[in-house]
Amino acid sequence: MGSAGALLWHTPQQLHGRGILFRQSRPLLRQRNLPLISLAAPALEPERRRRQCLRCAAVDGDGALRESGPLPQKESPSSGIGAALEDPPPGPPVENGSFGGPSQEEQSALYTFLYPSKDLLPDDKEMSIFDHLEELRDRIFISVLAVGAAILGCFAFSKDLVIFLEAPVTAQGVRFLQLSPGEFFFTTLKVSGYCGLLLGSPIILYEIIAFVIPGLTRDERKFLGPIVLGSSVLFYLGIFFSYTVLSPAALNFFVNYADGAVESLWSIDQYFEFILVLMFSTGLSFQVPVIQLLLGQLGLVSSDQMLSIWRYVVVGAVVAAAVLTPSTDPLTQMLLAGPLLGLYLGGAWMVKITGR
């Protein structure tokens, strides 16, 4: 047995007698462990009490457990890790997925429009993405079929439509020429296409509404009817205004300006390019009140903000008239800028009536 083993097998008195100095380690270890035991004892005391209470409650039955109520717990210096692992204190209630933020009633109308509450949505059948794509394909097919049928019907009466659209300037002595072979044929195709699209637009609008309306809330469905009706009326009103006021004024300006200098012999294709673009651009520009009403309902712009920028609106109306009209004369631009400004002010008034 080695020296280490010999030391372990001898008593302290024997080792001391042999001249080996031995230090009493056990009392020293006890003294060193006294502070550690004294610190750990308070931490273990609540746990012992809790176990004793649980044992008493188990013996007395469920009634004693209910009567005892919550068990008292004392905090201890060594319970920091356990406290960190416990559940956090309850925070403010979460409403409508806002994570403690403002409720849905306090949020903007745009947020409500993008993320409506389930209570506002009607109880319609849910569809997958493939069902939506299939429905979209069917509605596009119906729209194309309706527009194609309208174009064929207009092509059957294309000559009558050409004579009807030539009426604003025929009284001024203007004659139309066919400058290339087939020019009149392609002109009739163009006129038939524009008129067929105009006649088929109600069906296109209906298919769009039928596709979109299942995803709208009840309030949005009530609001959709006036928007669609107002948009359709304003579009056809713009076309009527262009045919009766804007186009004759612009064409008469050109005829009178060239009177005495040149004879007015116009290309049939260039004339219908001018008249058709002017009519449809005027119809689209008459949608300004509809856009204002939509922005007001979404809460993006108020009526006071619309009226406060009237100076910029005047400049914008003139610029828009210059872009929308195919001619460069100032008379046509002013004739279109005036109604645009009036429509803008009317739209701001409508937004104010609705409480925005």
UniProtKB/Swiss-Prot annotation:
Q: Which GO terms describe its biological process?
A: intracellular protein transmembrane transport; protein transport by the Tat complex
All ranges on the Lumenal side of the membrane: 165-195, 244-273, 327-330
Q: Which Pfam families match?
A: TatC (PF00902)
Q: For the region Disordered, what residue ranges are annotated?
A: 64-104
A single Gene Ontology MF term assigned here is: proton motive force dependent protein transmembrane transporter activity
Q: Which residues cross the membrane?
A: 144-164, 196-216, 223-243, 274-294, 306-326, 331-351
Q: Which cysteines are joined by disulfide bonds?
A: none
Kindly report every residue range on the membrane side named Stromal: 56-143, 217-222, 295-305, 352-356
Membrane topology reported for the UniProt record: Multi-pass membrane protein
Q: Quote the cellular component terms of the Gene Ontology held in the record.
A: chloroplast thylakoid membrane; TAT protein transport complex
The UniProt keyword set, sorted, is: Chloroplast, Membrane, Plastid, Protein transport, Thylakoid, Transit peptide, Translocation, Transmembrane, Transmembrane helix, Transport
Which superkingdom, per the lineage?
Answer: Eukaryota
Task: Give the transit peptide range.
Answer: 1-55
Of which family is this protein a member? Belongs to the TatC family.
Assembly and binders: In thylakoid membranes, TATC and TATB form a large receptor complex, containing about eight TATC-TATB pairs, which binds the precursor protein. Twin arginine signal peptide promotes pH-triggered docking of TATA oligomers to TATC-TATB receptor complex, inducing a conformational switch of TATA that results in activation of the translocase. TATA dissociates from TATC-TATB upon completion of translocation.
Under PANTHER family, the record lists: SEC-INDEPENDENT PROTEIN TRANSLOCASE PROTEIN TATC, SEC-INDEPENDENT PROTEIN TRANSLOCASE PROTEIN TATC, CHLOROPLASTIC-RELATED
Record-given protein name? Sec-independent protein translocase protein TATC, chloroplastic
- Can you name the source organism? Zea mays
The organism that produces this protein has a lineage beginning with: Eukaryota, Viridiplantae, Streptophyta, Embryophyta, Tracheophyta
